[in-house]
Amino acid sequence: MIVLLLFALLWMVEGVFSQLHYTVQEEQEHGTFVGNIAEDLGLDITKLSARGFQTVPNSRTPYLDLNLETGVLYVNEKIDREQICKQSPSCVLHLEVFLENPLELFQVEIEVLDINDNPPSFPEPDLTVEISESATPGTRFPLESAFDPDVGTNSLRDYEITPNSYFSLDVQTQGDGNRFAELVLEKPLDREQQAVHRYVLTAVDGGGGGGVGEGGGGGGGAGLPPQQQRTGTALLTIRVLDSNDNVPAFDQPVYTVSLPENSPPGTLVIQLNATDPDEGQNGEVVYSFSSHISPRARELFGLSPRTGRLEVSGELDYEESPVYQVYVQAKDLGPNAVPAHCKVLVRVLDANDNAPEISFSTVKEAVSEGAAPGTVVALFSVTDRDSEENGQVQCELLGDVPFRLKSSFKNYYTIVTEAPLDREAGDSYTLTVVARDRGEPALSTSKSIQVQVSDVNDNAPRFSQPVYDVYVTENNVPGAYIYAVSATDRDEGANAQLAYSILECQIQGMSVFTYVSINSENGYLYALRSFDYEQLKDFSFQVEARDAGSPQALAGNATVNILIVDQNDNAPAIVAPLPGRNGTPAREVLPRSAEPGYLLTRVAAVDADDGENARLTYSIVRGNEMNLFRMDWRTGELRTARRVPAKRDPQRPYELVIEVRDHGQPPLSSTATLVVQLVDGAVEPQGGGGSGGGGSGEHQRPSRSGGGETSLDLTLILIIALGSVSFIFLLAMIVLAVRCQKEKKLNIYTCLASDCCLCCCCCGGGGSTCCGRQARARKKKLSKSDIMLVQSSNVPSNPAQVPIEESGGFGSHHHNQNYCYQVCLTPESAKTDLMFLKPCSPSRSTDTEHNPCGAIVTGYTDQQPDIISNGSILSNETKHQRAELSYLVDRPRRVNSSAFQEADIVSSKDSGHGDSEQGDSDHDATNRAQSAGMDLFSNCTEECKALGHSDRCWMPSFVPSDGRQAADYRSNLHVPGMDSVPDTEVFETPEAQPGAERSFSTFGKEKALHSTLERKELDGLLTNTRAPYKPPYLTRKRIC
């Protein structure tokens, strides 16, 4: 019979849990319907499988089974209530079911109803009771209790005895609900009349009240026949004994004792004491357990027969039973002893001896990093078998993890996400749950689970650098590997599988895919064509790395700059002079009367390459065996190195092979043949007048009508004029040098000896005004490091001028530019600075009383440490920088200046290959001497007449270049007698000669030792001085 009782108790604790209650009778057959869980919960049966309807594993029972598709709960095997729940008044089976999506948990209680399937039974089929004949009516004698495994109304209800006149039964109920019978003597016994009485003792249960048990209702068990009442019998034999007048007596009928559980065996429970006033054996009392004590109590307790000591003999467990009833009897040893009875009620005190237990019902193996906070990860329950505070459990989640515990229902908890997860920060978490009770001392249990974080495509690929500069040499092989870009993705799996590509763009009107390609797997870049630096120097494009993530792939970009590196793949092309129309060599005519330095032509070439690959060098490779011609290796100017031999046959032209070579690796070159035809006649003007020895630098083309005598006379006249001018120029130079040396002794050494300030300026007078100051320092030699040229800001309009001739490529130009110098001499230190002054006005002045440049020279001592420049005191920082400048100036210089090792000064010995010696020059200095003669002593004043010439008289004036910027800064300085000046130098005598005089000269070879201040040193020094104004020529010229 099946009884279905649906209490429909739906508990929705935070919307997760519900509870159902069913009843079923024991001993039902397999397949008996218990209830439809899905229907009772109002669930859609068609969606049970999709929502993952299932039972919690640790709540399953073999007695019941659940159809997961229909939600029907039925009996799987027969249920024996007495076997499952023993004597418990309530027998409930628990089943937990849940739905995964969304998570819903339901607790189902199935109460097993008892049926009257067990009759009462006595421990023994024959019971014997001995009663003294002296027993008085009303005396009670407890009988052995019957046992009925059924509970409730089906349990033992009553006892019956065969009707008689001597005895009756009084049924008593124990504290635990069990019933036992006491035999009551109704009238005195007479052993002599009847020594033995036999009756049938019957135990009757409560069956037969109806078809269902307590709380029965409609359902599967309706309509079953009522259950029959069951009985059990035993033969009761009463033996009448001889009388024993006194019965032992206990102090009290009931004793109550409390013991903590887990008390060790041998622990005293109580010391019982019963007294008997009789003497001898009739008064000697012995103790024993009563016949109706439970078997479990016999196992747990022990009683001493002689002393009445009741002690623990087993393990007490509060969780098994909180109370035990121990029945003890005492009787004397006399004949016909009548026992006395008492009850010991043992209450077991709970001890915190059970740690909490954690049981996980469901655990998700992986949770997505994109899961929202509050997502359920695991479900578990916690139980503690102890009671009260010892059974109250608290749970916590260890560690700093983005999860938290959420209490759901009774002792059920869920682990949910507390914050958004990031797999890149942690791809797995070990969650440790600790359950701790409130006992003293508290017990705890921990259990760990592993939760994996599944990846979400939330990271875009990133390149190792945002911009790649890739250098590719031109003329590369198409399809060659040029570079590899790389990107990384913090995701994993398909979300981190990258594919490289190039974004579409146009390069010179064509798609980038015609220039480069990329390997989509490894990011290798390949050139699809051979690059030409002359057509395309650089281009840029973007590469993209895209992952294979879903639902949406992410991408990252980087810029790639392809920089084409030039190769020397273009030979120089000669563009002038051009060959004839029929491919005949270019032709030039050379007057027989041409002077050395005559500009025959300028060879011009171009190179499509760049940098060193396009820097060209010109040379004569063949046809110049007599060294008649020389070629400027930089400009390509072809000039005569000496006069044409008079005996040269005009019909035999010179065939020169000109080579133009670049500086690439390997170098490439081109050649051209130039036919030079000798002609007689007058010389026509030719641009590019000689910077060599020619007087005015202008030569005449020959006149076809002129005769040989006119040419010969003109040559003789020029030779005589050149010799005369050279002699006069040399004589003037010697006189000037002697005068300068004398004035230097007078003006410099004397001033130093008197510790005065020496004022020298190439632009005007005033140099003697400061020499009148009194001397307070010791004499000191003047060294080159004691000279500093400084720029003057207050420049008047009448400086001295020195005209300088500068040679251009196609003519001669004269420029007048004047510079003022300030020579600062320091008597206290040999480290003095050399600085420029501003250029003076180009107008010429003869006023000897006025100082046009405003230049001053002051010596400084310990009391006056600063240098006065432009009317202001120089700072200490400037002094420090001046010391650094002096250090560089005083460094050991290279003997034989490297500047003269370049092919800047040419002579007739040069064949065009740079084989002339240093300082060689065949130039005529006639016109140069004439200019020098006009302005050479324009700086002298009235003081020079009285005291001798000072330094400013012989110091040369620097002349800047014309409006065009020169190709080389060394060509912007002019030294008389030299075609082009590679470097301006300072010459000084060795310091080993104590009597040697120091001078400031620019005339090339007059000193044995000379050194060059390199351009980089000068630029650095001038920058460190922090002058208020930096003229442009300081960055282009060298100084001595």
UniProtKB/Swiss-Prot annotation:
InterPro entries recorded: Cadherin-like_dom, Cadherin-like_sf, Cadherin_C, Cadherin_CS, Cadherin_N, Protocadherin/Cadherin-CA
Cytoplasmic side, ranges: 737-1040
Signal sequence, start to end: 1-18
Residue intervals passing through the bilayer: 716-736
PROSITE patterns given in the database record: CADHERIN_1, CADHERIN_2
Residues glycosylated per entry: 273, 557
Compartments (UniProt record): Cell membrane
Organism: Homo sapiens
Keyword Transmembrane assigned: yes
Tissue and organ distribution: Moderately expressed in all regions of the brain examined, as well as in testis and ovary, and low expression in all other tissues tested.
GO cellular component: glutamatergic synapse; plasma membrane; postsynaptic membrane
Name the UniProt record assigns to this protein: Protocadherin-10
Keyword Kinase applies: no
Record topological domains on the Extracellular side: 19-715
One Gene Ontology biological process: nervous system development
Gly residues: bias regions: 207-223, 686-697
Record SUPFAM superfamilies: Cadherin-like
Residues covered by region (Disordered): 207-228, 686-708, 899-927
Gene3D superfamilies: Cadherins (2.60.40.60)
Domain of life: Eukaryota
Keywords of this entry: Calcium, Cell adhesion, Cell membrane, Glycoprotein, Membrane, Receptor, Repeat, Signal, Transmembrane, Transmembrane helix
Biased composition (Basic and acidic residues): 910-926
SMART domains for this protein: CA
Domain Cadherin residues, every copy: 19-122, 123-250, 251-358, 359-463, 464-574, 582-690
Membrane-topology descriptor: Single-pass type I membrane protein
Molecular functions per Gene Ontology: calcium ion binding
